[in-house]
C-alpha cells in the first residue's frame, strides 16, 4: 500500500476574519465563500478552491461565539496580521501514516476527531493530527515576520465518509506552487521525509510558507 499523502488544504489565519477574506479577494480576484463555525473553538472559516481536491481555508475568530476556554487553534490569538500559518495533507490511511512517521522519528501528534456544520446545516466530520506544543520550535516550526508561530510540517487529515470541502462547488484560484523558508532546511526536510511529503525549501531567517496562485493578471503570492 502506498502512503504518499496529497495536499489537502492551506491554512491562512487572521486576527479579523472579514479583513482576511477581503485581502484574499483583493489579491486573487476571487472571494472565498463561508465554510462554517468551529463550535467551542471560537473560530469560523471561509474557503477557496485551489484546483483538484485542494483548497484554501481562511480562518479567524468568530465574533458570534463566546471566548473559548482554551487558545484558538493555529496560534490565531497571537496574530497581528493575516498570513499563511500551516498546511494539511491527506494520506490514504491516516493511522498508518502516523505510525510510519513515528517509526522514522517524527511524531505528528495525537489524532483527534473534529466537526463543523456548513451554512446549509450539513455536518462535516474529520480526524486530524494535532502537533504537541513543546518548549521551543521544532524542526518544522519557526517565527513569521510578525513574531507569530509558523508550522512548516503539515498536519495529517482524514475526512472519512464526509464529502470533501473541495467537492462543494467552491470558487477556485489554481495553486501554481508551494514553498517554504526555514533557518534549518536540512532539519525541515528530514521531517518532511518522515511524513512522506515533498516541499520546496530554501534557507533563510525565520519561517515562511508561500503559495503562488494564478491571479487575475498573472501569478500572485500569498504568504
What are these regions (language model features)?
Residues 2-7, 12-31, 50-223:
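Glyoxalase I/VOC metalloenzyme domain signal
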Residues 34, 40-53:
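N-terminal low-complexity or amphipathic/hydrophobic leaders
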Residues 39-40, 116:
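Positions that flank functional sites
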Amino acid at each position: 500500500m502506498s502512503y504518499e499523502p496529497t495536499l489537502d488544504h492551506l491554512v491562512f489565519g487572521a486576527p479579523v476574519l472579514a479583513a482576511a477574506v477581503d485581502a484574499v479577494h483583493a489579491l486573487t480576484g476571487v472571494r472565498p465563500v463561508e465554510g462554517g463555525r468551529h463550535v467551542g473553538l471560537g473560530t469560523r472559516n471561509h474557503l477557496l478552491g485551489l484546483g483538484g481536491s485542494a483548497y484554501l481555508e481562511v480562518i479567524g475568530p468568530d465574533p458570534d461565539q463566546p471566548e473559548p476556554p482554551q487558545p484558538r487553534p493555529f496560534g490565531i490569538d497571537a496574530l497581528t496580521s493575516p498570513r499563511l500559518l500551516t498546511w494539511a495533507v491527506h494520506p490514504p490511511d491516516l493511522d498508518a501514516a502516523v505510525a510510519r512517521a513515528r517509526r522514522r522519528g517524527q511524531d505528528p501528534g495525537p489524532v483527534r476527531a473534529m466537526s463543523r456544520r456548513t451554512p446549509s446545516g450539513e455536518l462535516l466530520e474529520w480526524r486530524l493530527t494535532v502537533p504537541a506544543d513543546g518548549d521551543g520550535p521544532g524542526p518544522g516550526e519557526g517565527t513569521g515576520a510578525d513574531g507569530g508561530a509558523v508550522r512548516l510540517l503539515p498536519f495529517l487529515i482524514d475526512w472519512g465518509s464526509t464529502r470533501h470541502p473541495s467537492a462543494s462547488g467552491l470558487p477556485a484560484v489554481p495553486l501554481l506552487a508551494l514553498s517554504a523558508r526555514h533557518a534549518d532546511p536540512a532539519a525541515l526536510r528530514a521531517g518532511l521525509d518522515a511524513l512522506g511529503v515533498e516541499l520546496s525549501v530554501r534557507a533563510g531567517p525565520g519561517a515562511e510558507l508561500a503559495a503562488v496562485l494564478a491571479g487575475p493578471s498573472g501569478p500572485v503570492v500569498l504568504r
